[in-house]
């Protein structure tokens, strides 16, 4: 099994790269999806979040009120550290279980771990390769506004709450520039895949 770490800032094109790699045959483990699963009603992580941030972060149906929690943690580094201290260990445990399952199913699998906070979480996985999806901050802010309807001020705050591009790029073995067209991104991903299969 080869384990590839895929990371990048918010709206950097990680999901586009992960989807393309899945189409080509990679087993993709999505840390964001796992992060949603580990805070579902009844989970220990959701109970810890409630204790740390109060009942206001729980919606009437018992689910996590993500906008309310986001309003608390984005822009408050101490609150974000508390949240990450709750969620990251749960996500890492579940992710490890999925890597192991992929290796059992196919010892030659190429497993792509799509993990936005790879640098922030001081990830200790033995990646064979770390790939960074990169677009400049202005492009990412525009995508957040145009594609996700995020308020420009909120977009800037969200981008600013993450590690710097320089820190993220310093962790890269390979950078995929996602600032151009979709076809240009796909060409880079296809070349990566050919190298991994070679």
Curated annotation (Swiss-Prot):
Coiled-coil annotated spans: none
Keyword Transcription: no
Compartments in which it is found: Cytoplasm
Chain ranges passing through the membrane: none
Major localisation: cytoplasm
Keyword ATP-binding: yes
Pathway: Cofactor biosynthesis; coenzyme A biosynthesis; CoA from (R)-pantothenate: step 5/5
Keywords, in A-Z order: ATP-binding, Coenzyme A biosynthesis, Cytoplasm, Kinase, Nucleotide-binding, Transferase
Gene Ontology terms describing biological process: coenzyme A biosynthetic process
InterPro entries, per database record: Depp_CoAkinase (IPR001977), P-loop_NTPase (IPR027417)
Molecular function via GO: ATP binding; dephospho-CoA kinase activity
A GO-annotated cellular component: cytoplasm
Domain DPCK residue range list: 3-198
EC number(s) per entry: 2.7.1.24
Ligand binding (ATP): 11-16
Catalytic reaction list: 3'-dephospho-CoA + ATP = ADP + CoA + H(+)
HAMAP family reported in the protein's UniProt record: Dephospho_CoA_kinase (MF_00376)
Similarity comment text for this entry: Belongs to the CoaE family.
Protein function: Catalyzes the phosphorylation of the 3'-hydroxyl group of dephosphocoenzyme A to form coenzyme A.
Protein name: Dephospho-CoA kinase
Source organism: Leifsonia xyli subsp. xyli (strain CTCB07)
């Amino acid at each position: 099994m080869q384990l590839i770490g895929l990371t990048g800032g918010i709206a950097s094109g990680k999901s586009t790269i992960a989807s393309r790699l899945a189409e080509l045959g990679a087993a993709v483990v999505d840390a964001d999806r796992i992060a949603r699963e580990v805070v579902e009603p009844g989970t220990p992580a959701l109970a810890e979040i409630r204790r740390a941030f109060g009942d206001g972060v729980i919606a009437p149906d018992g689910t996590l009120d993500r906008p309310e929690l986001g309003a608390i943690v984005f822009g408050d580094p101490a609150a974000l550290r508390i949240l990450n201290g709750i969620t990251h260990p749960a996500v890492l445990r579940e992710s490890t279980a999925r890597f192991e399952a992929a290796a059992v199913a196919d010892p030659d699998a190429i497993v792509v771990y799509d993990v936005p906070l790879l640098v922030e979480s001081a990830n200790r996985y033995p990646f064979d390769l770390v790939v960074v999806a990169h677009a400049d901050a202005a492009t990412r802010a525009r995508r957040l506004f145009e594609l996700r309807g995020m308020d420009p001020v909120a977009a800037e705050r969200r981008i600013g709450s993450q590690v710097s591009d320089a820190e993220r790029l310093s962790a890269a073995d390979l950078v995929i520039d996602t600032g151009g067209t979709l076809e240009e991104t796909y060409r880079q991903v296809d070349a990566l895949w050919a190298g991994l299969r070679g």
